[in-house]
């Protein structure tokens, strides 16, 4: 049984009748996986596009210094036309601006006036320089309301403490956020983002008590630290299952870069 099968088995063992997977309807709270970390979250009557990487298969060189640097990204094609990924969306959630979450194709074809939520002003300034005009930075201190939905930024770490002690690697890893979605009468959704399991993840779980947790679990690794991931992996799925037996786990960001 391979890693993907193991993770999917762990995730599917947990169910929540109030949330659907791969059901693309604004009338149903649901998550539609597209590719990599890209997906559509239908929530409380609104649709969010998450971390759009919209290039065709093999457009980009592999990430230098990673175990899969010899492979060109993305590894697979989109399951739909790129334009269909953002059809009828209300906003974009951009957890960070690494190429596998925000690529040049997305920057080119997305409507410049679309609402985009980013992790901080620095990413907001970058998007403004790319021509986007409707940007809101989320904050750890203060929630943001969007069309009756409460968005909270959550913390994390795109690698271990030891990795961030290496200045060059710390600059590459940089920052990434998670986001929680809350609305009256709807399940709480926690989009974890690109992070390893940290005290900030525990803090978010304890504070928001998610009914649904979308986890980036590809266990990506660098050549400098081959024994540690820069995002979550199988052990983190098992940990989440044990910690949150009644939470639906959705595992993504595994096999496309």
Regions found by a protein language model. Name each.
Residues 1-7:
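Bacterial N-terminal signal peptides that target proteins for export
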Residues 15-16, 20:
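N-terminal signal peptide c-region/cleavage motif recognized by signal peptidases
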Residues 21-28, 34, 119-186:
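Metallo-beta-lactamase
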Residues 24-81, 172-193:
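Conserved beta-strand hairpin/beta-sheet module of binuclear metal-dependent hydrolase folds
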Residues 46-93, 104-107, 161-165, 198-207:
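Pre-active-site segment of Zn-dependent metallo-hydrolases
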Residues 50-51, 88-98, 117-120, 189-195, ...:
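Active-site neighborhood of phospho(di)ester-bond hydrolases with catalytic His/Asp-centered motifs
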Residues 59-62, 79-144, 155-160:
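Active-site HxH/HxHxD metal-binding segment of metal-dependent hydrolases
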Residues 74, 196-257:
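Cap/insert and terminal regions of metallo-dependent hydrolase folds
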């Amino acid at each position: 049984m391979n890693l993907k099968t193991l993770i999917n088995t762990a995730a599917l063992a947990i169910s929540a009748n109030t949330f659907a997977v791969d059901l693309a309807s604004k009338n149903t709270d649901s998550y539609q996986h597209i590719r990599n970390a890209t997906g559509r979250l239908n929530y409380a009557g609104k649709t969010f596009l998450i971390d759009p990487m919209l290039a065709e298969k093999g457009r980009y060189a592999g990430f230098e210094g990673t175990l899969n640097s010899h492979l060109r990204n993305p590894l697979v094609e989109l399951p739909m036309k790129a334009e269909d990924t953002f059809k009828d969306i209300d906003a974009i959630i951009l957890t960070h601006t690494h190429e596998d979450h925000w690529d040049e194709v997305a920057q080119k074809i997305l409507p410049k006036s679309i609402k985009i939520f980013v992790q901080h002003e620095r990413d907001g300034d970058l998007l403004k320089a790319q021509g986007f005009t409707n940007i809101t930075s989320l904050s750890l201190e203060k929630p943001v309301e969007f069309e009756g939905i409460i968005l909270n930024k959550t913390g994390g770490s795109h690698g271990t403490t030891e990795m961030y002690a290496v200045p060059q690697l710390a600059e590459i890893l940089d920052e990434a956020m998670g986001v929680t979605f809350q609305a009256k009468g709807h399940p709480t959704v926690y989009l974890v983002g690109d992070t390893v399991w940290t005290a900030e993840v525990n803090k978010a779980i304890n504070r928001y008590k998610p009914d649904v947790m979308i986890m980036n679990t590809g266990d990506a690794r660098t050549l400098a630290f081959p024994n540690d991931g820069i995002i979550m992996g199988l052990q983190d799925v098992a940990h989440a299952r044990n910690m949150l037996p009644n939470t639906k786990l959705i595992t993504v960001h595994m096999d496309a870069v």
